Amino acid sequence: MALSMDNIVISNEEEICMMKAMHLPCGLYLNMVLKAAIELDLFEIIAKSTTQKLSSYEIASQIPTKNPNASSLVLERILRFLASQSLLTCNITKNDDGNVHTTYNLTPLSQSLISDKDGTSIAPFLLLATDPVGVHACFHLKDAILEGEIPFNKAHGVHAFEYHGKDSRMNGLFNKAMQNLTCIEMKRIVECYNGFQGVKEIIDVGGGLGISLASIISKYPNIKGINFDLPHVIKDAPTYEGIEHVGGDMWDSIPQGELIILKAVLHSLDDEDCVKILKNCWRALPNDGKVVVIEQIQPKYPETNLLSKRSFSFDISMMIMFHGGKERTKQQFEDLAKQAGFTYIKVVARAYYSWLIELYKY
């Protein structure tokens, strides 16, 4: 009797563990297939169709291929793989003539990879994560253990941010990824955090192109925003109503204001440098002022939930990219804040993977 593939239930723990181990080497393929799908605009093509259900041939006819018939056969395998990862839904129907017709449509998960009404998505961040420049650095992970090397520096001979300054393509890729991720996170932050109410002025330290402040001021138009970053960064920043772009160096001094934002700044620094930046923030605040740190918080113990997996994954990313960079626990943030002179710290909200941590001067 032939073994049926339908309704298979595997309950043997030893078999399950071995099957998981066999699947581990396949993890690379998901990111690489997603990279190809985004570069080919597959998700956007499906989203823009009138039915939002397309066959591999219908998709292939909309991408720059010389032979849609041949390409659709390869594309079909890509689409089936994505469906197996819950990134597409596979629909199989029979035509009147008895032939099988297969179409694919988006799932809630793949919706995050297409542009929303503001033109943002997770796709640019995935392209950054799978770019050969960063991937090449991963091959030197063992050198961080054996030689104390920074993997990115070992791979490319320079610090990550210095590399971005020399490679306009990579710099553009990085900026686009950060812009999209910031837009997505800040939409949630202004929804879940009310600590900006009643504030007259906000300083965003390392604010890049001013996207975080723009999101805040869109909800609180009476706030004056100062977007503080290096001169070569803010020179390309767009004009926003209510925001002044100020060039400077956070290592020297920070503009004075009642509320200072540090978003995704501390995790790229070692502890000593974190304290230096936090001390400069402390000096720039009035006695009743506060810093709002927006970072991931690493759990004390590794767990298998999404928050834990993302935090420990990004911790590896920081180890690859920066000397002393790391994700930190709540206690580690408290220790840094106290060393810098802050008297009270409170975790007040979460937006996706980022936590909002208030540091009070007095």
Swiss-Prot record:
Transmembrane parts of this sequence: none
Principal EC category: transferase
Database matches in CDD domains: AdoMet_MTases
SUPFAM superfamilies: S-adenosyl-L-methionine-dependent methyltransferases (SSF53335), Winged helix' DNA-binding domain (SSF46785)
pH dependence remark: Optimum pH is 7.5 with myricetin as substrate (in the presence of S-adenosylmethionine).
Active site annotation, chain numbering: 267
Heme in keyword set: no
GO molecular function: flavone 3'-O-methyltransferase activity; myricetin 3'-O-methyltransferase activity; protein dimerization activity; rhamnetin 3'-O-methyltransferase activity
Keywords assigned by UniProt, alphabetized: Methyltransferase, S-adenosyl-L-methionine, Transferase
Tissue: Mainly expressed in leaves secreting glandular trichomes types 1 and 4 and, to a lesser extent, in storage trichomes type 6.
BP GO terms, sorted: flavonoid biosynthetic process; methylation
Pathway field: Flavonoid metabolism
Keyword Methyltransferase: yes
Positions annotated to bind S-adenosyl-L-methionine: 229
Family the entry assigns: Belongs to the class I-like SAM-binding methyltransferase superfamily. Cation-independent O-methyltransferase family.
Assembly information from the UniProt record: Homodimer.
Physiological role: Flavonoid 3'/5'-O-methyltransferase involved in the biosynthesis of polymethoxylated flavonoids natural products such as myricetin derivatives, aroma compounds possessing antioxidant properties and exhibiting pharmacological activities such as anti-carcinogen, anti-viral, anti-thrombotic, anti-diabetic, anti-atherosclerotic, and anti-inflammatory effects. Catalyzes S-adenosylmethionine-dependent regioselective 3'/5'-O-methylation of flavonoids; active on various hydroxylated flavonoid substrates, including myricetin and quercetin, but inactive toward kaempferol.
Protein name, entry field: Myricetin 3'/5'-O-methyltransferase 1
Species the sequence originates in: Solanum habrochaites (Wild tomato)
Lineage, opening ranks: Eukaryota, Viridiplantae, Streptophyta, Embryophyta, Tracheophyta
